[in-house]
Structure formats: structure tokens, C-alpha cells
Amino acid sequence: MGRSLKKGPFADAHLLKKIDAQKDSEKKTVIKTWSRRSTIFPSFIGYTIAVYDGRKHVPVYVQEDMVGHKLGEFVPTRTFRGHGGDDKKTR
């Protein structure tokens, strides 16, 4: 279920402040955030945002086709190690 259109998209205020601060400075650095729930706005394009996955910050370079999605969609939180296999090799 999506968010109501009358509410509009959501992004944490501290993340928007960090993006605006980057626009004023000439040097682009990686922006760290814990806000996986924030929607990617068009103003985020071209920035690298390090999104927390529960263990470490994973850098995500924001491109045009990512607009409208959430930051957490691009950083998986679980590591798939494969299904249990046959133990015939060990016997």
C-alpha cells in the first residue's frame, strides 16, 4: 500500500539539510544517513548517500531512475548464504 497523495512524499529533515549544505559547498562528500525510509527526490541526483544496513553504511550513487523510490530499497539488510545442501560430500 502506497502513501496517500494528499500527504506527499517523505524525507527526513536532517537528510534534506545535509543535501542543501552539499549544494552550497563545492566539494562533494559522502552523506551518511540512517534514514532508509526517506524518499529520493530529484534534488538528490548526483550525490552519494551512505545508507545504513544494520551493520555498516553502504554507499549509493543516486541516479535519475531512482527518484520516487526509498533509500532502503537499494541496500539489502540480509545476506543470503544459500539453502542447505546435501551432506553426501562430507560423509
From Swiss-Prot:
InterPro entries: Ribosomal_uS19, Ribosomal_uS19_bac-type, Ribosomal_uS19_CS, Ribosomal_uS19_SF. The keyword Acyltransferase does not apply. PROSITE patterns: RIBOSOMAL_S19. GO terms for biological process: ribosomal small subunit assembly; translation. Keywords: Ribonucleoprotein, Ribosomal protein, RNA-binding, rRNA-binding. GO terms for cellular component: cytoplasm; small ribosomal subunit. Pfam families: Ribosomal_S19. The keyword Iron-sulfur does not apply. GO terms for molecular function: rRNA binding; structural constituent of ribosome. Protein S19 forms a complex with S13 that binds strongly to the 16S ribosomal RNA. Belongs to the universal ribosomal protein uS19 family. This is Small ribosomal subunit protein uS19. The lineage of its organism: Bacteria, Bacillati, Bacillota, Bacilli, Lactobacillales.
